[in-house]
């Protein structure tokens, strides 16, 4: 199968209508053609600035417009961020993601952000940030500091977007992705499933992502975590098989990308997660919280990986560049030498 950038809604709807087992089989064939099997890339996400966001994203408990239990915090000191990054590395993460509840970073924040990037890079970790919209100059500053990935989700289809967010446009998001790519960084961009969108909207999201000039290197697929106090707290649950189907379709449409299980994984049992890995998911967030929602504990993750024969990647290499027995030794080391959980780690629904 060749990598394409001209997908249509009709093609995606056809994939959605395929028998479940046939779809997973096709996705697994694509996965084995383009990705190493039985490997999962592990990332940790830290909220470096929490709450008081001026935007009105209806899914987000960090919005200042909604009454939630989120405690507001200023931008974290660089030293605290580096301490958290070291703990994440010790626990087995290979990528450290830093998220701030902003519409966009201010110029006064940029020196602190670049110091964080340089410090985390110095530990041998890949770096990722999600800070809201960026100007071309800000993107260049982050890239110069060594930022590897920038996360900026499209969230949903262009047609449904206005039902969820009004404080920035869909084009604003696409422009930020363009600035990131022009600055030479890799892109992490996906969406959220379960906000009341239709099947057509889910297809539209994947079409937007897959028809970008270059596919995002990482595609997080979030399952909405309903938080009390947000406008979406009463929305209907996502049908698990529908979610797994979208993982499979994302793998088929973007075969070279990492497809990440992100927010909502805490609500998935082991069997559902296993089917997601079968469908082509090969990246997870690791730690006790994503930004403001629960995430499976490290122990539960490693137990599941061991049951499935999955090895998480210790370093930023292609899995075929690492000896299999070396990876197994590293998994054992993580299980026996893991530090205690730390409330600094947060789960990602960004």
Swiss-Prot record:
Domain Radical SAM core as annotated: residue spans: 38-256
Coiled coil: none
Catalytic reaction equation(s): (4R,5S)-dethiobiotin + (sulfur carrier)-SH + 2 reduced [2Fe-2S]-[ferredoxin] + 2 S-adenosyl-L-methionine = (sulfur carrier)-H + biotin + 2 5'-deoxyadenosine + 2 L-methionine + 2 oxidized [2Fe-2S]-[ferredoxin]
Class of this enzyme: transferase
Cofactor note: Binds 1 [4Fe-4S] cluster. The cluster is coordinated with 3 cysteines and an exchangeable S-adenosyl-L-methionine.
Required cofactor(s): [4Fe-4S] cluster; [2Fe-2S] cluster
GO biological process, one term: biotin biosynthetic process
Positions with a binding annotation for [2Fe-2S] cluster: 97, 128, 188, 260
Pfam family, one: BATS
Role, per record: Catalyzes the conversion of dethiobiotin (DTB) to biotin by the insertion of a sulfur atom into dethiobiotin via a radical-based mechanism.
Name this polypeptide is given: Biotin synthase
């Amino acid at each position: 199968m060749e990598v394409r950038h001209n997908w249509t809604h009709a093609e995606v709807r056809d994939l959605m209508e395929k028998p479940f087992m046939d779809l997973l089989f096709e996705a697994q064939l694509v996965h084995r053609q383009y990705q190493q099997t039985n490997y999962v890339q592990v990332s940790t996400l830290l909220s470096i600035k929490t709450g008081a966001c001026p935007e009105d994203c209806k899914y987000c408990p960090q919005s200042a417009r909604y009454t939630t239990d989120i405690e507001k915090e200023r931008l974290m000191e660089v030293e605290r961020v580096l301490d958290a990054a070291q703990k994440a590395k010790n626990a087995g993460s290979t990528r450290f993601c830093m998220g701030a509840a902003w519409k966009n970073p201010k110029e006064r924040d940029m020196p602190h952000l670049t110091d964080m990037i340089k410090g985390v890079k110095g530990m041998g970790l890949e770096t990722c940030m999600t800070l809201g919209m960026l100007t071309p100059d800000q993107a260049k500053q982050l890239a110069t500091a060594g930022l590897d990935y920038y996360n900026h989700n499209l969230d949903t289809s262009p047609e449904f977007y206005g039902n969820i967010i009004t404080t920035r446009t869909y084009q604003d998001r696409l422009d930020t992705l363009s600035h990131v790519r022009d600055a030479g960084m890799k892109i992490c961009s996906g969406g959220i499933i379960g906000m009341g969108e239709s099947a057509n909207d889910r297809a539209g999201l994947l079409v937007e992502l897959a028809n970008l000039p270059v596919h995002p290197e990482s595609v997080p697929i979030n399952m909405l975590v309903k938080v009390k106090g947000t406008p979406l707290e009463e929305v209907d649950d996502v049908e698990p098989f529908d979610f797994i189907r979208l993982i499979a379709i994302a793998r088929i449409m973007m075969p070279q990308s990492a497809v990440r299980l992100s927010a909502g994984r805490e609500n998935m049992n082991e069997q559902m997660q296993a089917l997601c890995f079968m469908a082509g998911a090969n990246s997870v967030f690791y730690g006790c919280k994503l930004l403001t929602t629960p995430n499976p504990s490290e122990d539960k993750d490693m137990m599941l990986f061991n049951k499935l024969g999955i090895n998480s990647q210790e370093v930023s290499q292609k899995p075929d560049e690492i000896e299999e027995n070396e990876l197994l030794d590293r998994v054992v080391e993580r299980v026996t030498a893991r530090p205690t959980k730390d409330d600094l780690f947060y789960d990602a629904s960004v």
